Amino acid sequence: MALLTDLLNLDLSGSTEKIIAEYIWIGGSGMDLRSKARHLPGPVTHPSKLPKWNYDGSSTGQAPGEDSEVILYPQAILKDPFREGNNILVMCDCYTPRGEPIPTNKRYNAAKILSNPDVAKEEPWYGIEQEYTLLQKDINWPLGWPVGGFPGPQGPYYCGIGADKSFGRDIVDSHYKACLFGGVNISGINGEVMPGQWEFQVGPTVGISAGDQVWVARYILERITEIAGVVVTFDPKPIPGDWNGAGAHTNYSTESMRNDGGFKVIVDAVEKLKLKHKEHIAAYGEGNERRLTGKHETADINTSSWGVANRGASVRVGRETEQNGKGYFEDRRPASNMDPYVVTSMIAQTTILWKP
């Protein structure tokens, strides 16, 4: 008699050419990920070869009950680390039956901006540092924290090791390897300043693929925490008080910034961001005012500043970038719950397309 684990790990490649495709989309809150699976007659390597699909948008807060059908357009394919073999994860965006993007489809406008010829020729690179917090399932309290109590003050936890400093490493390492298997351009992980909080980095990725890959990496993380019986939150300030919040620092460069003379291009871009500070803050994640206080390695939400090697600034330029006269900058304002489609396209629009 086969056990449940045997069936979960069943290798289908020897018995059928069919594959399983897990279609992923963003739900009505703008942060909730949804997915469902279907089989296909054989391996698929490009999203244009995949069929569109549909779902009940009235059950995700994205359509009324009397006209509930929302259409999924496949946009990116990655390997499925849970089913393995030729099975795939499919990142989709969402449209009405008439082919119009629904309001929560932020990818559509992002793709328009990032495919603009003036943007495309600059080949924008993004490196996104996604922070998150692991919570004990039934009490919504950080992993490793005593129930109803607090751990010792911050200090020993950042990149810390040991059972009294590092909580959830099995989840984090599983996520790292699953992303690598799937084809996410994940570039690293580390424990964060607050215990129970972690970070993974995606990038450098070019253009719209940055958003696709961050969303799929989030999906993989939520699936792994589901298996582990742990909750992941992207709340930018999950614990009030003298504890670090959670951000999604976004590193960015263009071809002009990476070439000789690029430092001036960086300074000009950062000055543009200062002029659009309020608009960017409004789009950089909900609850960010609880995080951007001017404390805990953040700038105050009401001010816009930049500096070399300054982690208390809105935008940080690396010391190496200054020395080389070219490179990239880091926008430290985005919250952990930001939409990477919105943030990446908005930075490109402000720094490349906008003429003040």
UniProtKB/Swiss-Prot annotation:
Domain GS catalytic: 106-356
Gene3D superfamilies according to UniProt: Glutamine synthetase, N-terminal domain, Glutamine synthetase/guanido kinase, catalytic domain
Keyword Cytoplasm among UniProt keywords: yes
InterPro entries the record matches: Gln_synt_N, Gln_synt_N_sf, Gln_synth/guanido_kin_cat_dom, Gln_synth_cat_dom, Gln_synth_gly_rich_site, Gln_synth_N_conserv_site, Glutamine_Synthetase
GO biological process: glutamine biosynthetic process
EC assignment: 6.3.1.2
Subcellular location: Cytoplasm
Domain of life of the native organism: Eukaryota
Ranges for domain GS beta-grasp: 19-99
Ligase recorded as keyword: yes
SMART domains in the cross-refs: Gln-synt_C
Note: In barley, there are distinct isozymes in the chloroplast, and cytoplasm.
Family of this protein: Belongs to the glutamine synthetase family.
Protein name from the UniProt record: Glutamine synthetase
Organism from which the protein derives: Hordeum vulgare (Barley)
